[in-house]
């Protein structure tokens, strides 16, 4: 039967199978609707009666025919009406039969089921059979002979290394992969073994996918891409089948690049023990991926490039040499890289002459390539909303505020007492930020509600930091405590506005003590999963971290007390203008003026 079905299916072809399936489903639907309508019509003409009503009909001689099926009576009256009733007691059924027969009605003992009951029994079977057949046909059509989630073809956009701004060291590392795909004999002549796989790791938005496309375009080979999550399914065996289909397509397309985005979805470390069915399906898919990466020869011209921002989750067997021979970290761009990225994304955006991309690059440390693209896009949207002909520095500055501090909520009505308390809180942050020597310069302060905050103080680093000194971290805690210190000194009370500051300060203090060894406890590490996490040691870590936070709060209180007059002047300016820039802030603190970053650069 199965072979006959397969032969007929091949003869029909894809279009014929679809038409046959649609026809079959149409017939099933017509039969189902017919049975349902018939049962509905019959039930509409019938009325359910009681035993007493049946006795009255029999005594009046209104019945012309009576059908008895078990405990069910169907009585047809002279006017065409149909009455049904269920009589459970056998003696009462016998009495009714005698009365109807005595009244001259024909009595028939029928064994057939009522049409409505037959329809209710047949309908579920027919519907389930139709749904099962449809699922069977669809599953055959979606069989993993061709992995539908693979995006094949040459690199879709002409992306080359020149279009990938920044990341000079990363591009040099990947250039050898391009040379291998272009001229593999150059490596084989000296017995060199080209890499089978390249793992790109880094923060989200740093351009890992863009780099993989650039490699394929530079080498002039096909680019097969798939997401790691597309290998995961609830059906057992589907993930492994899709892995086989992907590499089968790669062998046909060789030389080519197979790119697996977010490989941690399929390549995370296998759990110990048996686990549940979902873990078994994941392990089977991962095992198939490991086998496939070992299964092709170096001469096939297939290079697997994968990306992830969770390299710590990957299975060790996947990371060994012979599978992913090279691990390339794609870092966040430095100031030179940020300027190059801004130049690329600013190409289609009309900028006014005073827009300085190098200044923007210096003021956006920690931004990824995606963040910088989003920054310029937000600035262009603001300019278009205002009907401007070009993007000016104010648009970029407001776009940066939106990215860093959140959306401005102009419709929120804030009570005057809360506005004053918010201004005092933010002024405390500013005062500590100006006087603590290692703090990043305060760039802007605002008491306009943004996101979930009623006010924001923005401090921008002067340079990229590759490591953090103890003094810098202590000053960060002190600045975070500046808002609470101002509340205690100026308001004489405390508000809930410092909750986020306290949480961030506690996190920094705990890491300084528990992971970085920056306390009298010495160089210890009791982070998550570390074997030396004894309860007594954790208690000492908590006490030391709390003491560190309290010490910086006391220091912030002293700074606020020493600058009480300047803080009150800043509060007054904030209540008038709501948002103050660097020059307006330093006008309130003339004795604590810091040189601007552009002045230092000059």
Swiss-Prot record:
Positions annotated to bind Zn(2+): 425, 429, 501
**Which Gene Ontology CC terms are recorded?**
plasma membrane
Q: Where does ATP bind?
A: 202-209
> Mind listing the GO biological process terms from this record?
protein catabolic process; proteolysis
Q: Which residues form the signal peptide?
A: none
What is the main EC category here? hydrolase
Q: How does this protein lie in the membrane?
A: Multi-pass membrane protein
Task: Give the co-factor note.
Answer: Binds 1 zinc ion per subunit.
UniProt topological domain (Cytoplasmic) ranges? 1-18, 139-602
- Protein's name in the database: ATP-dependent zinc metalloprotease FtsH 3
Which species is listed as the source? Answer: Sorangium cellulosum (strain So ce56) (Polyangium cellulosum (strain So ce56))
């Amino acid at each position: 039967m199965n072979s006959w079905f397969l032969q007929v299916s091949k003869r029909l072809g894809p279009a014929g199978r679809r038409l046959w399936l649609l026809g079959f489903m149409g017939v099933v639907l017509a039969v189902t609707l017919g049975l349902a309508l018939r049962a509905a019509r019959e039930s509409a003409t019938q009325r359910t009666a009681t035993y007493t009503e049946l006795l009255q009909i029999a005594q009046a001689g209104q019945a012309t025919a009576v059908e008895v099926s078990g405990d069910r009576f169907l009585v047809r009256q002279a006017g065409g009406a149909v009455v049904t009733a269920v009589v459970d007691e056998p003696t009462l059924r016998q009495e009714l039969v005698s009365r109807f027969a005595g009244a001259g009605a024909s009595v028939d003992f029928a064994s057939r089921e009522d049409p409505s009951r037959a329809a209710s029994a047949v309908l579920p079977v027919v519907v389930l059979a139709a749904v099962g057949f449809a699922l069977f046909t669809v599953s055959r059509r979606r069989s993993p002979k061709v992995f539908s989630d693979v995006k094949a073809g040459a690199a879709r956009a002409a992306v080359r290394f020149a279009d990938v701004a920044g990341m000079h060291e990363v591009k040099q590392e990947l250039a050898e992969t391009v040379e291998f795909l272009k001229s593999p004999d150059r490596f084989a002549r000296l017995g060199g073994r080209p890499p089978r796989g390249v793992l790109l790791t880094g923060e989200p938005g740093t351009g890992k996918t863009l780099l993989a496309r650039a490699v394929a375009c530079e080498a002039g080979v096909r680019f097969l891409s798939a997401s790691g999550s597309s290998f995961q399914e609830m059906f057992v065996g589907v993930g492994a089948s899709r892995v086989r289909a992907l590499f089968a397509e790669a062998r046909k397309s060789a030389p080519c690049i197979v790119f697996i985005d977010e490989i941690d979805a399929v390549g995370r470390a296998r759990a110990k023990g048996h686990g549940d069915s979902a873990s078994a399906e994941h392990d089977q898919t991962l095992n198939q991926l490991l086998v496939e990466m070992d299964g092709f020869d170096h001469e096939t011209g297939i290079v697997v490039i994968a990306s992830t921002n969770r390299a710590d989750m990957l299975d060790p067997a996947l990371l060994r040499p012979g599978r992913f021979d090279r691990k390339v970290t794609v870092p966040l761009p430095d100031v030179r890289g940020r300027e190059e990225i801004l130049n690329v994304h600013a190409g289609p955006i009309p900028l006014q002459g005073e827009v300085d991309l190098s200044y923007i690059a210096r003021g956006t440390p920690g931004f990824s390539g995606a963040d910088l693209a989003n920054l310029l896009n937000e600035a262009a949207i603001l300019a278009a909303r205002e009907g401007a002909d070009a993007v000016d520095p104010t648009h970029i500055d407001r776009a940066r505020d939106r990215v860093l501090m959140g959306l401005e909520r102009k419709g929120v009505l804030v009570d005057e007492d809360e506005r004053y308390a918010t201004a005092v809180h933010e002024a405390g942050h500013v005062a500590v930020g100006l006087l603590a020597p290692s703090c990043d310069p305060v760039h802007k302060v605002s008491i306009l509600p943004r996101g979930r905050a009623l006010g924001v103080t923005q401090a921008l680093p002067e340079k990229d930091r590759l490591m953090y000194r103890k003094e810098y971290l202590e000053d960060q805690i002190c600045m975070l405590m500046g808002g609470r210190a101002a509340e205690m000194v100026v308001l004489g009370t405390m508000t809930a506005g410092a909750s986020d500051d306290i949480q961030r300060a506690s996190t920094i203090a705990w890491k300084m003590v528990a992971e970085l060894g920056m306390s009298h406890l010495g160089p210890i590490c009791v982070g998550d999963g570390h074997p030396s996490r004894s309860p007594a040691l954790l208690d000492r870590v908590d006490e030391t971290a709390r003491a560190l936070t309290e010490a910086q709060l006391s220091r912030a209180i002293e700074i606020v007390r020493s600058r009480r007059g300047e803080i009150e002047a800043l509060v007054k300016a904030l209540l008038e203008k709501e948002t103050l820039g660097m020059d307006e802030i330093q006008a309130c603190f003339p004795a604590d003026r810091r040189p601007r970053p552009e002045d230092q650069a000059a």
